[in-house]
Amino acid sequence: MLIPLKKMIFAGQGGSDIMIRKVNRKDIPECVRVIRYSHQTVADEFGFTKENAPRYVAFATDENRLIWHMDQERRLMFLDEENSVIRGYYSLLVKQNGECELSNLSVLPEYRHQGIGTRLFRHAISIAREHHCRMMRWSIVEENTLLRNWYERYGAVHTGTEKYDFFPFTCGYMEIRL
């Protein structure tokens, strides 16, 4: 069972501290970089560009968008850091209907395959439960079967797809009961 946590600290290699904590306003520029750079690998793999997918997260995320998420939508925003280096990010929009929306779960490519994404996803589930959410939903690039399979390993269910004119890919939708 996951325990509710506002901040998680893990013992890192060589005595370093690994922490998941809330995003502060001063973190936003670096969080933008983490999101854009993380999602650029998917853009490169599937041929998305600013021209054919200007609304894709790797191209559309900027400081104003994250400030809007923080101030207007009141999203819960968290980052993973080790020794003050931000390595990962996610946000959670808590809705009134007992659901929440996970967005922009990101891990910088050079830090992948170290359990950071798993820790961030589990943290998101824990925070969603703290806020009395019964369901967490999110979207993925449907063609990214590696990512879909990764989420399914943690109990997520694929719920459908949607093709939009403004994306050169199909949006896949996933959820997990909490």
Residue ranges of each PLM-predicted region?
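C-terminal "cap" of GNAT-fold acetyltransferases
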Residues: R134-R137, V141-R148, E152-Y154, T161-L178
